[in-house]
Swiss-Prot record:
Organism of origin: Xanthomonas campestris pv. campestris (strain B100)
Name of the top EC class for this enzyme: hydrolase
Gene Ontology MF term list: GTP cyclohydrolase I activity
Name this polypeptide is given: GTP cyclohydrolase FolE2
Keywords: Hydrolase
Record-stated family: Belongs to the GTP cyclohydrolase IV family.
Gene: folE2
Database matches in InterPro entries: GTP_cyclohydrolase_FolE2 (IPR022838), GTP_cyclohydrolase_FolE2/MptA (IPR003801)
GO biological process, one term: tetrahydrofolate biosynthetic process
């Protein structure tokens, strides 16, 4: 003899009648198949799945249905088309709740193998935090891709102050001399060229782009390379001395305030995406606080200040 298991969400009405904008689950651990992921093609992700609950008298949604749909769909390689199918399946599974909207979020790190700046055949792994958000409402799907890119930033003002100190030191040590041999100047610079080091630091750019309808893939690597090319000083993995020297040269040739970094990214993104947002943060080596800048394509007048996360 089998007894029917109780389902309170179905059999008992809500004591307080009110529609709910979103109901679901977050921080679901799940593997994601990603063609761009190296070396295995699978990444460990954290997922959020939610639907709306417009019927005010219903006590709750069917959480297990959402979990099973997420699990089943993510057996396929991740793509915009697959996420669109998942969103529609989530809505269809809650027809008895009157649901008309669904949203999914996936957060993970993708590992990309990047070559050294100069050393032939040398490469190393770099991890890039990624977030993908997808939402469907009234038959219309929207998708957004977000990545974090680490880079080095060197303060233009600090570099100018350093050059001034070097110039003064050279003038003081060679006062009264009317002619200097090139090799003597070169030797002096070799000994004293780092009289003062401008303050530089690791920095992060968080870039978010809205994807156009019917896009075939997320193409995470392409967005990473676009951002790193715009900034010109991405952090490195495997390096030898020749690569470290090349990195120093790049930093010296690309001095930038936080404003410069944001504008560089804006210029490149505006040529390829109709809708995007950029938030850059420099973990200042001189100060006990960070420098930040934001830009984007949207026309919103008011934005909440982003929550700070220590690095």
């Amino acid at each position: 003899m089998s007894a029917t298991l109780p389902d309170i969400a179905v059999t008992e009405p809500s004591a307080l009648h009110a529609p709910l904008r979103w109901v679901g689950m977050q921080d679901i651990a799940i593997p994601v198949r990603l063609d761009e992921a190296e070396p295995s093609g699978t990444v460990a992700a954290r997922a959020q799945v939610q639907v709306d609950l417009p019927r005010p008298e219903l006590k709750g949604i069917h959480m297990s249905r959402l979990y099973r749909l997420l699990d089943r769909h993510l057996e396929q390689p991740l793509s915009p088309a697959m996420l669109s199918q998942l969103l529609q399946a989530m809505i269809d599974s809650h027809a008895d709740c009157g649901s008309r909207a669904a949203r999914v979020s996936l957060a993970f790190e993708v590992m990309l193998r990047m070559p050294a700046l100069r050393s032939e055949g040398l490469a190393g792994w770099r991890a890039y935090p990624v977030r993908i958000d997808a939402q469907s409402r009234a038959g219309r799907s929207e998708m957004r891709l977000q990545i974090d890119v680490l880079y080095a930033s060197t303060c233009p003002c600090s570099a100018a102050l350093s050059r001034q100190l070097l110039s003064k030191a050279f003038a003081q040590q060679h006062a009264g001399q009317t002619a200097l041999r090139v090799e003597d100047v070169a030797q002096w610079l070799q000994r004293n060229g780092s009289y003062a080091t401008p303050h530089s630091q690791r920095s992060v750019a968080q870039v978010r782009v809205d994807l156009v309808a019917r896009v075939q893939s997320f193409d995470i690597r392409a967005l990473v390379l676009l951002c790193e090319s715009a900034l010109a000083t991405p952090v490195q993995a495997a390096v030898r001395r020749i690569d470290e020297q090349a990195f120093a040269r790049l930093n010296g040739a690309n001095l930038m305030y936080v404003e410069d970094a944001a504008r560089r990214l804006r210029k490149e993104l505006a040529e390829r995406y109709a809708s995007f947002h950029v938030a850059v943060r420099h973990f200042e080596s001189l100060h006990a606080h960070d420098a930040v800048a934001e830009t984007g394509s949207d026309a919103d007048v008011f934005h909440m200040i982003a929550e700070s996360h220590g690095q």
